[in-house]
């Protein structure tokens, strides 16, 4: 089975795609072509984790807001020019899988042009521009939240399946860092804001253990002076890190909230103010409404406020892990739809 996949720029778009592809690979023999942004995280991660995937690197930039900015003309032209390269690969595929980010749009557009069925998966409460545009032609649309349905055109809502966010997991993986620690995550590229805030927290909080993914080796060195903090620049086997944690402090990106809900971990979500369309804030508020987390906005974030919320979170019960990974539901549905 030949698949053309796209989704990247950040881990929030990449990892859901990879988790679905990994589940599909358990059910069928796959031949995967993955369309990457030249400077996206997928261009670095996929050669390490899935060297068997054929990578096609495309030099694109996302549209600036508002969309009518003159600089977007050049960007739209590049997107259009990339379609001929994409078409050469998609001619060979059985179907497409897109998980958002602007690389998804030209890939989905070419699938439509060549009459290849394709599926989209949306991780955030408010869908991105690429997925909204592709929804009209998609065979099936997978979303993480019930609320997301209302943001899509009424004409496509009969194609939407609410599954939750797909998660990568290895059941036989041992816990990496022991157990009963607070997991601190700044997203796939790290967060200077969270790093700076937590450095101040570590100066006064010595009773709790922390595992902190910093995004850079410089921050690992800087935080190494704290005995109760295990700092790493990046956590490659995330499932092992989640299994030993008792709570999480993190941004509200799609990968994080998917794993948080899957592993039943309570936490503090600090939405990134710079996220497109405030999607992290909407994600965080939805999780808080579900009673699974507390939201801490950047403008309210102080050491005392964070610690107060952290001790509240530690009183919340850790829920049992989900019985079925949404990635499995999505993979099975795709195969059913293709029959």
From Swiss-Prot:
UniProt-listed SUPFAM superfamilies: UDP-Glycosyltransferase/glycogen phosphorylase
GO biological process, one term: cell division
Keyword Transcription regulation: no
The protein's name in its UniProt record: UDP-N-acetylglucosamine--N-acetylmuramyl-(pentapeptide) pyrophosphoryl-undecaprenol N-acetylglucosamine transferase
Membrane protein topology class: Peripheral membrane protein
Gene: murG
Domain of life: Bacteria
Organism the protein comes from: Pseudothermotoga lettingae (strain ATCC BAA-301 / DSM 14385 / NBRC 107922 / TMO) (Thermotoga lettingae)
Gene Ontology CC annotations of this record: plasma membrane
């Amino acid at each position: 089975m030949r698949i053309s996949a796209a989704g990247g720029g950040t881990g929030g778009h990449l990892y859901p795609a990879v988790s679905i592809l990994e589940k599909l690979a358990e059910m069928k023999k796959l031949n995967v072509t993955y369309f990457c942004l030249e400077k996206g995280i997928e261009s670095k991660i996929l050669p390490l984790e899935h060297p068997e995937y054929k990578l096609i690197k495309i030099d694109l930039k996302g549209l600036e807001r508002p969309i009518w900015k003159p600089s977007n003309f050049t960007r739209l032209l590049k997107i259009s020019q990339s379609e001929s390269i994409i078409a050469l690969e998609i001619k060979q595929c059985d179907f497409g899988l897109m998980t958002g980010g602007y690389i998804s749009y030209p890939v989905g557009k070419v699938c439509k042009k060549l009459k290849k069925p394709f599926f989209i998966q949306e991780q955030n409460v408010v869908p991105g521009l690429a997925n909204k545009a592709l929804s009209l032609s998609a065979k099936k649309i997978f979303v993480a939240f019930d609320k997301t349905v209302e943001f899509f055109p009424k004409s496509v809502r009969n194609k939407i399946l609410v599954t939750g966010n797909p998660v990568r997991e290895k059941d036989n993986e041992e816990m990496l860092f022991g157990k009963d620690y607070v997991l601190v995550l700044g997203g796939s590229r790290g967060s200077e804001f969270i790093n700076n805030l937590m450095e101040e927290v570590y100066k006064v909080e010595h009773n709790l253990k922390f595992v902190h993914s910093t995004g850079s080796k410089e921050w690992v060195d800087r935080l190494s002076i704290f005995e109760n903090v295990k700092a790493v620049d990046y956590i490659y086997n995330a499932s092992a890190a989640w299994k030993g944690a008792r709570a999480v402090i993190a941004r509200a990106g799609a990968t994080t909230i998917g794993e948080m809900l899957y592993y039943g971990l309570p936490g503090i979500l600090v939405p990134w103010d710079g996220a497109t369309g405030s999607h992290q804030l909407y994600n965080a508020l939805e999780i808080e409404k579900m009673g699974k987390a507390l939201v801490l906005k950047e403008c309210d974030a102080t050491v005392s406020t964070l610690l107060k919320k952290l001790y509240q979170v530690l009183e919340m019960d850790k829920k049992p892990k989900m019985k079925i990974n949404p990635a499995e539901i999505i993979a099975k549905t795709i195969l059913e739809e293709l029959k």
